[in-house]
């Protein structure tokens, strides 16, 4: 039995055909008209709360608008626009066979303060926001990511299709060595649970699986102790794959299938979309002392649901990855969350 019961979406993509509804609550004026520096300076504005209001309102929207971001003509090509296109080639190690460290720097290239963003696609999907935040806060962001290769080492790691994946272990060790030699101020890390071979741990209990994944996470954190960096772990994102096998409306294709009842797709309860295993493994109580959790899930879900679209913008590019446009749009709220943790 495989731990991750879904294909790696950036390699075997179920392309999202998403459309969007007009919401009665908008943060567009905030996110589109103000510069990142203005976002940091104007601390009286609660961008996270504004975004939460928009996410909540989206659950009750019904009809599709004419204009969407990105445009409908690009829906079948969202995978090629994943992350920042200008740096994708040098930053994103997609091929299974590659195990080299990407040469990727975002944010403020000449800054004296450096952080590392490490992990799999769950880390890379936030690069548009980290890039804007780094530029505004004079922080260099070194990105060390590989598709389908979570940052935490696991002796039974396999590829999403169940095949052997030795390149992931090589990449993981190279990332650790790079971090320990770089001595960044912070390491921000994100990733899914390791993919296990078919049949492995088939009779394991949920508690046993959690114990194994938690041990993997702690092993990674321990391995970069020599860097003396502070460590921040990004909260697990919502995962529509958790219901894909039993619920026909959880795939983002739901939106194009229900043009006059988008609320059917936008109102899935948060409790049904949480990656419970990773959420438990990445809670403050389960992590070593001093490690902080970055609640970026607040940029994707309200307290009760996780809409696929908000206003005229796609939230997700597939079942569990943030669209590039949404990651750019929520920079004000992203900045508020990250700066509150003193990562800057």
Predicted feature residues:
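Extracellular/periplasmic envelope-modification machinery, especially enzymes
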Residues: 2-344
């Amino acid at each position: 039995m495989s731990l991750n019961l879904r294909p790696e979406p950036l390699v075997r993509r179920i392309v999202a055909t998403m459309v969007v509804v007009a919401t009665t609550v908008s943060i567009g004026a905030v996110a589109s008209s103000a510069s990142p520096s203005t976002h940091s300076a104007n601390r009286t504005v609660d961008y996270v709360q504004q975004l939460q209001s928009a996410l909540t309102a989206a659950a009750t929207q019904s009809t599709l608008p004419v204009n969407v971001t990105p445009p409908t003509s690009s829906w079948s090509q969202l995978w090629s626009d994943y992350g920042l296109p200008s740096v994708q080639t040098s930053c994103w190690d997609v091929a299974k066979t590659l195990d080299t460290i990407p040469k990727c720097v975002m944010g403020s290239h000449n800054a004296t303060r450096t952080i590392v963003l490490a992990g799999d696609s769950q880390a890379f999907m936030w690069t548009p926001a980290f890039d804007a935040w780094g530029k505004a806060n004079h922080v260099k962001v070194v990105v060390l990511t590989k598709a389908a290769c979570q940052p935490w080492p696991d002796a039974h790691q396999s590829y999403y299709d169940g095949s052997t994946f030795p390149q992931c272990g090589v990449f993981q060790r190279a990332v650790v060595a790079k971090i320990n030699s770089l001595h960044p101020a912070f390491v921000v890390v994100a990733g899914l649970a390791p993919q296990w071979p078919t049949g492995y741990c088939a009779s394991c209990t949920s508690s046993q699986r959690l114990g194994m994944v938690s041990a993997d996470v702690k092993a990674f954190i321990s391995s970069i102790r020599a860097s003396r960096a502070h460590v921040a772990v990004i909260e697990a994102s919502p995962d529509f794959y958790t219901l894909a096998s039993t619920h026909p409306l959880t795939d983002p294709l739901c939106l194009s299938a229900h043009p006059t009842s988008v609320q059917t797709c936008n109102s899935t309860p948060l409790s049904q979309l949480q990656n419970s295993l990773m959420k438990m493994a990445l809670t403050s109580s389960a992590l070593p002392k001093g490690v902080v959790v970055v609640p970026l899930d607040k940029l994707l879900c309200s307290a009760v649901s996780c809409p696929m679209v908000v206003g005229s913008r796609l939230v997700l590019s597939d079942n569990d990855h943030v669209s590039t446009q949404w990651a750019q749009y929520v920079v004000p709220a992203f900045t508020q969350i990250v700066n509150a943790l003193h990562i800057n």
